[in-house]
UniProtKB/Swiss-Prot annotation:
Cellular component annotations (GO), alphabetically ordered: cytoplasm
Annotated binding of substrate, by residue: 141-142, 283, 292, 301
Cofactor(s) the protein requires to work: Zn(2+); Mg(2+); Co(2+)
Oligomeric form and interacting partners: Homodimer.
Gene: pdxA
Function of the molecule: Catalyzes the NAD(P)-dependent oxidation of 4-(phosphooxy)-L-threonine (HTP) into 2-amino-3-oxo-4-(phosphooxy)butyric acid which spontaneously decarboxylates to form 3-amino-2-oxopropyl phosphate (AHAP).
Protein name stated in the entry: 4-hydroxythreonine-4-phosphate dehydrogenase
Organism: Janthinobacterium sp. (strain Marseille)
Gene Ontology terms, MF aspect: 4-hydroxythreonine-4-phosphate dehydrogenase activity; cobalt ion binding; magnesium ion binding; NAD binding; zinc ion binding
Upper lineage: Bacteria, Pseudomonadati, Pseudomonadota, Betaproteobacteria, Burkholderiales
Pathway annotation from the record: Cofactor biosynthesis; pyridoxine 5'-phosphate biosynthesis; pyridoxine 5'-phosphate from D-erythrose 4-phosphate: step 4/5
Binding annotation for a divalent metal cation: 175, 220, 275
Length: 343
């Protein structure tokens, strides 16, 4: 890349694998990405030294960045915006005292993206229970980012470049009980989701004319109404409205046949109706290299597709695979480049 994108990495739950995989990925991609870790500078420096003594971290104060922006630094350095821990970290052992610390790192990432310090945010995994135990109601990264940026509707996408061509799967619903899915899919909600997908595929992925395949909700896409009428009464009218505006959206297709190469090679994204309809295929195909992307935000955010892995953290450094973090950073960099071009 001619210009290294500046990417902030929130280091996640300090007792998990987030700090390690963040440092490893940032160091590996230092030639192509200007990485800014957000977390406790002393703790991250200690972790980096244990991973590889050659890794060089450069600490920045938040106030200095607010005053002057992110300074230039060499390609053999990783910057850290210091955000002090509340309590000593024991790998693999959660401490609610550090719950608010995790949110502070997110707040800095959001502030920096909105102020133009960063081109994108990549989030390492956090532990929801620790934040809730700290007295802060918290349901997840996505909801927190939406709330902090005053975004009414967001779309969860999983993506991977580990397949013959990029595979992107957007979700019409996310972490919702299966019995509640049908009621959650309305004409208004689905139209909004499709609008976000189309806009972000254009503006954040650089796809001028996105091609979207849409899955049905019911087996066999409803079998003409015999197995459910959501395809007839909700999904098809939304697709027809988008098609009337000139967009290439197709469906609804039976989900059990949609994920075939002959269909995917002629598409930029699949829209699945619920979590376990679309994600098993992607997770199987991605070989652990899936990336979680939040669309609809006024910033670029990607994340790993796994959790804090406290057991691996407790076992010591070198146990965790940082492949998903590498892909999250690469896709964030690609999106940042596309966003610069489209703006």
């Amino acid at each position: 890349m001619s210009k290294r994108p500046t990417i902030a990495i929130t280091s996640g739950e300090p007792a998990g694998i987030g700090p390690e995989i963040s440092i490893r990925a940032a160091w590996e991609l230092r030639a192509d990405v200007k990485s800014i870790l957000i977390g406790d500078a002393a703790f991250l420096a200690m972790t980096a030294a244990a991973i590889n003594p050659a890794i060089r971290l450069s600490a920045l104060s938040l106030q200095a960045v607010r005053n002057s922006g992110v300074p230039d630094f060499s390609r053999d350095q990783i910057a850290v915006i210091d955000c002090p821990l509340a309590a000593h970290v024991v790998p693999g052992k959660l401490d609610a005292q550090n719950g608010r610390y995790v949110l502070q790192t997110l707040d800095i990432g959001i502030e920096g993206a909105q102020q133009g310090w960063f081109d994108a945010i990549v989030t390492a995994p956090l532990q929801k229970s620790t934040i809730n135990d700290a007295g802060v109601p918290f349901t997840g990264h996505t909801e927190y980012l939406a709330d902090k940026t005053n975004t009414a509707q967001v779309v969860m996408m999983l993506a991977t470049n580990a397949t013959p061509q990029p595979l992107r799967v957007g979700l019409a619903t996310t972490h919702l009980a299966l019995k509640d899915v049908a009621a959650a899919i309305t004409i208004d909600s689905l139209a909004g989701i499709l609008d976000i997908l189309l806009a972000d595929l254009q503006n954040k992925f650089g796809i001028a004319k996105p091609r979207i395949l849409v899955a049905g909700l019911n087996p066999h896409a409803g079998e003409g109404g015999y197995l459910g009428r959501e395809e007839i009464e909700v999904i098809t009218p939304v697709l027809q409205a988008a098609q009337a505006k000139g967009f290439d959206v197709r469906g609804p297709y039976p989900a059990d046949t949609l994920f075939q190469q002959k269909y995917l090679e002629d598409a930029d994204c699949v829209l699945a109706m619920y979590h376990d309809q679309g994600l098993p295929v992607l997770k199987y195909a991605s070989f652990g290299l899936g990336v979680n992307i939040t669309l609809g935000l006024p910033l670029i955010r990607t994340s790993v597709d796994h959790g804090t892995a406290l057991d691996l953290a407790a076992a010591g450094l070198g146990q965790a695979d940082h492949g998903s973090m590498l892909e999250a950073m690469r896709i964030a960099a690609q999106m940042a480049a596309a966003a610069r071009t489209s703006s």
